[in-house]
């Protein structure tokens, strides 16, 4: 099992990227926020999950063990494949996704592409209370600026859950960000 690779980002493609490691180019599928953060020509370490399917081997890459653990937890639900798991990790920051799973918040899970009400309810039911505590560590408390940014994004027509997820992720990176900065960066991610 390949659990970690370090190498050069050779090329970014739709839904994944090619990582040159040890003279071999590996294609890794990855969540959208991770893909957007990657730069071609830069070295990166990637936590991986290798999946054997009828069509062959598929490799999935994540920026940290937290994302990888959530991906594997989601795959444990019947009816959830790698495409849905990646969609959830692309739509919601890891800590918000972990919180939604812990609390069984199916409504928040439906903000991911390809996750309908029934599937969200199944995920929420099967994983409610099963999220390891370390995935919730370091949760950030929302600020007034974050709440203002979420309301502004909702007024612009974005789903509140999706806007909140992106704003919380941005706030985790910069806890002192002002509302207008959060809105500006969130718009880049949401478009």
UniProtKB/Swiss-Prot annotation:
Protein name: Holliday junction branch migration complex subunit RuvA
Compartments reported by the entry: Cytoplasm
Role, per record: The RuvA-RuvB-RuvC complex processes Holliday junction (HJ) DNA during genetic recombination and DNA repair, while the RuvA-RuvB complex plays an important role in the rescue of blocked DNA replication forks via replication fork reversal (RFR). RuvA specifically binds to HJ cruciform DNA, conferring on it an open structure. The RuvB hexamer acts as an ATP-dependent pump, pulling dsDNA into and through the RuvAB complex. HJ branch migration allows RuvC to scan DNA until it finds its consensus sequence, where it cleaves and resolves the cruciform DNA.
Keyword Calcium: no
Region (Flexible linker): 132-143
Chain residue ranges for the region called Domain II: 64-128
Single biological process term from Gene Ontology: DNA repair
Region (Domain III): 144-191
Activity over temperature: Retains HJ-binding ability after an hour at 90 degrees Celsius.
This protein's domain notes: Has three domains with a flexible linker between the domains II and III, and assumes an 'L' shape. Domains I and II are responsible for tetramerization and subsequent octamerization. The flexible linker plus domain III (residues 129-191 in this study) interacts with RuvB.
Region (Domain I): 1-63
GO cellular component, one term: cytoplasm
Species lineage: Bacteria, Thermotogati, Deinococcota, Deinococci, Thermales
Organism: Thermus thermophilus (strain ATCC 27634 / DSM 579 / HB8)
């Amino acid at each position: 099992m390949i659990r970690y690779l370090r190498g050069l980002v050779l090329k970014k493609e739709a839904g994944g990227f090619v990582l040159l490691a040890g003279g071999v180019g590996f294609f890794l599928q990855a969540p959208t926020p991770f893909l957007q953060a990657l730069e071609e020509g830069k070295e990166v370490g990637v936590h991986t999950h290798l999946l054997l399917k009828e069509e062959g081997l598929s490799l999935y890459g994540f920026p940290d063990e937290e994302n990888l653990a959530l991906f594997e937890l989601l795959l444990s639900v019947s009816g959830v494949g790698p495409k849905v798991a990646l969609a959830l990790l692309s739509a919601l920051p890891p800590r918000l996704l972990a919180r939604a799973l812990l609390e069984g918040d199916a409504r928040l899970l439906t903000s991911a592409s390809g996750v309908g009400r029934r599937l969200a309810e199944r995920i929420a039911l099967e994983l409610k209370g099963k999220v390891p505590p370390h995935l919730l560590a370091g949760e950030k408390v929302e600020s007034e600026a974050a709440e203002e940014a979420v309301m502004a994004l909702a007024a612009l027509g974005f789903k509140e859950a999706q806007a909140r997820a992106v704003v919380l992720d941005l706030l985790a990176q910069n806890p002192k960000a002002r509302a207008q900065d959060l809105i500006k960066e969130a718009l880049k991610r949401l478009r």
